[in-house]
């Protein structure tokens, strides 16, 4: 007897598991300074953390969760991104700490969208908060700001009182760094644990990894490794990073002999 994969819950779950595993493999390759992994208990619940190294949010470390729809990836509903702590940003609701993805995606299309696109958007709103609230330019050349966002107070503060906004953001950055080492709120083994940098302990792992960039970074006097690693400083660099990754994925799909012929012809 033949069973439809739609009517067989077990097969549907297996297929969904493969989709989620594929998404995780893409996430590991696509972006820097932001990390996400499916929880051990449920693949629809992802743990994430972002390290912001530049811009007005520099020094911030924010934890978040990504909740995928039950029928992911077929469901057109967007994932839900929830931050663990209060984050001052026009697109983040101060009450439930959710990120508004509607300005980024209208609906989820499984053949076009991936979780790494959501992570890239999270990076973009912190790299360029002003750009994230603009819809274009007026005929006079002035920037047109959105009429409605999740946090209108943050929007008005950013648009009309930028120094005060920066002050509040920097205060939150200090708090976020203090909270990042707190005990995990869950016993899930996939929860991302962050430890303070300890040269005596971590240099041993770096030597094992034999990574030239890390060794060079840790050889700098009186500086943390993160200060010398590659950073994404603007939305332009985010676009360049995406273009590089798309090219890498495209090249990976081309058979090796065809790539060699293409390179020779160039």
From Swiss-Prot:
Q: InterPro entries in the record, alphabetically? A: UBQ-conjugat_E2_core, UBQ-conjugating_enzyme/RWD
Q: Where is the composition biased (Basic and acidic residues)?
A: 245-266
Q: List the SUPFAM superfamilies hit by this protein, alphabetically.
A: UBC-like
Cited PROSITE patterns: UBC_2
Q: Which domain of life is it from?
A: Eukaryota
Stated family: Belongs to the ubiquitin-conjugating enzyme family. FTS subfamily.
Q: Supply the name of the protein.
A: Protein crossbronx-like
